[in-house]
Structures are given as C-alpha cells and as structure tokens.
Amino acid sequence: MSSLAALGPAKSGLISWSENLPPKVRANVDPIRTAIAAADAEGLAREVTAEATRRLSEFVTGIRAYRNHPYRRPPTQARPVWQDGSSRLLDYGGRGRPVLLVPSLINRAEILDLRPGASFCAWLRDNGHRPLLLDWGVPGEAETDFDLGAYIGERLGGALDAATKLAGGPVPMVGYCMGGLLTLAAALAHPGKVAGLALLATPWDFHADQSGQTGMLATAAALPSEPGTPPLPIDLIQALFASLQPNLIQAKFRRFATMDPDAPETEAFVALEDWLNDGVELAAPAARDCLIGWYRDNTPARGAWKVAGQAIDPADLTCPAFVALPTRDRIVPPASAGALATALPDPTVIEPRAGHIGMMIGSRAESALWEPLGTWLKIEC
C-alpha cells in the first residue's frame, strides 16, 4: 500500500532519492525513474493497485493462519529457587556447574527456552551444565521506579548471590542482548562472584550504526521524568523495534500463508511469533536510561555510563570473556557489538552467520553458538 501512496509523487518527480544508497541500489535508480516516467499513469496505477491488493490479502491470510494455529508452548519444567518482586531465578537442573543466564528486560526470558529442540537451557542441562535463568518478570508496583541501576543492584545482584550459593563459589554469567550490558555491570561490581562472562549480541557503541534509530530518539525525547510514571507500554516498544525493519512484518506473514500448517518450521514460526508478541513493559526510569542514556547519549561507548557511581569500563573486567557477534544482526548492528569486543581484554570472539534471534534459536544455533559457548564455559570457567 505504501507503493500505491507513493505512485503519484514518483510519477511527478516529487520523490528524491537518497544520496546514501548502497552502490548496488543506486545502480537501479535511473532505470526505475525512467520506467516510471515513461509508463502510462492509469495503467501503472491499476497494476500497482492490483499488486497491493494481492499482497494485503496474503498478509491477512497469514495472520489468520497464525492466530488459528493450535501450537501452544508447553509449561516449563524449571523450578524457581529465588524470587524478589516480579523477578525469579529458574533452575533447569543438571549435574554440572551452575551458569547464570540473563536475558533482556524487554522480552520474556523464554527465548532461552523457547520450545523442545530450540532451548538453549535444555541444551546446557544435557551437556554438562546447570542453567539458572533469570526471569525478570513484568514490572509491578515494586518495580515502578526501577532504573537500570536498581535492576542490576537488586535483582541481578540477588540472583547472582543465589547462584553462587548453589554453586558454592563464583559462577559464569551469560548475558543476551541488553542482558549483556547488565551482566557486565554486575561482573564489574562483584568480580569475586563471577567466573566468566559471555556477552551475546550485546550492544556497546549505540552510534556506530544509527540506521533505524529515529524512532528510538523520538521516543526518548517524549519520555516523562516524574516519579511514578507508568511503564513504557509493550506496544510502543514493539513498534520501535518494528521500525528497524519496516517491511518485515508483512513479508513474514505473507510467507507464513504459504507454509504447510503441519510442518516443523510452521510450529517454529508460531513459537517465535508468540514470544515476540508477548513482550514486557519497561519501567519508566529504566526506559529513560536505555533510550536517553544509551541510544541518545551513547554513554557506554563514551565511558559515561555509571551504575551506583561506578564507571562501566569493559577494560576493567578481570574474568575470562566470550563475545558472540552475529553477522546478520539488524537489532544490534555488528559494529555496535564489535566495539564491546574491542574494549574487552583478550576476549574469545565468534561471529555466527545468523541474525539476532536466529543465533539463539535457529536451525544452526547448536553448531553456531551453543557448542562453542559450552566448550568455552567448560575450559575457561
């Protein structure tokens, strides 16, 4: 439908082309401009309308197929071993050494235990480790005024204490996405409790690749600062991340409309989509820290991010470090995460050929991430 809206201005020459287009794209600009100018206006409008209608119909069909699919995620078999407010530490068992897993604040922790066959937690348990998953939960009354420092100090700090008690000593931590930044701060605050730190698709230089940040910065400017401000709604958070790939939603549901409802990949799609659509609100002070401190002011890369008065400097990390840089990540650009790898002292670095989420739960996740990370945990931690 966006093509239909742009047709008139494009035909009249009112749409200018960006000077920053990649060379391969720019090579097609002149032929497209010439073809539009030469086309019969009414005929072109009919063709564009027909194509837009077809795509919209496929999109709606895909959404209906998704909503009617019978798959439901089975209940987790993990048991809570610690809780504070809305946050819990889930123990997946296993005879190996405890490993503390820390996901992002803005998505459900289930991405690390998505479904049978796509569960990092289950793989760790079955391969000589004892995964402990920090489930941040949904912000409630106790978390209304939590900033990132409160989440790190009170919730992550409490979970780390519980994990070290179970282990009888320091434990390795694995932070995914935003969770990596939080674990880095915790590791610097409690070096004696952390045996190693793995950072998976973790941003650091938020200005290294600013594509898609317009929505983030606009939201940051509109955030109120009064105490007791309600959490940032999940619908707004999802809209911000959807803006990074504006055409992805319609494309994936059009593709889903053509998939066999009984195929394993269809179940995988539904499981992931259920997780994406079941996001978590973000406490307003924490949202300000992220959108203003990180995205607008780039405090981590500038050396200006502080937690409880301590500057968060990766160079100060004393335990072994592991960094995963997925090369096809659209959520955390490789340049942003790569800056963290550069700032750490002698980390082990891998570069899975995957996206932000595919690295963790895709068909090649075991060989691309789980196995090298599991080996590193056993050798270095």
How would you label these PLM feature ranges?
Residues C319, P333-T342:
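Short alpha-helix in the alpha/beta-hydrolase fold that links the catalytic acid
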Residues L317, V323-L325, D329:
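Short beta-strand/loop motif that positions the catalytic acidic residue
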Residues M1-A37, G169, L182-P285:
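Alpha/beta-hydrolase-fold enzymes
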Residues D145-K165:
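Alpha/beta-hydrolase active-site loop
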Residues Y66-R67, R72-G140:
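Short, surface-exposed "cap/lid" segments of acyl-processing enzymes
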Residues I331-P334, A354-A368:
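Catalytic histidine-centered segment of alpha/beta-hydrolase-like enzymes
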Residues M173-G175, L200, A324:
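Short beta-strand immediately N-terminal to the catalytic nucleophile in serine-hydrolase-like folds
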Residues V174-T183:
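Gly/Ala-rich beta-loop-alpha elbow adjacent to hydrolase catalytic centers
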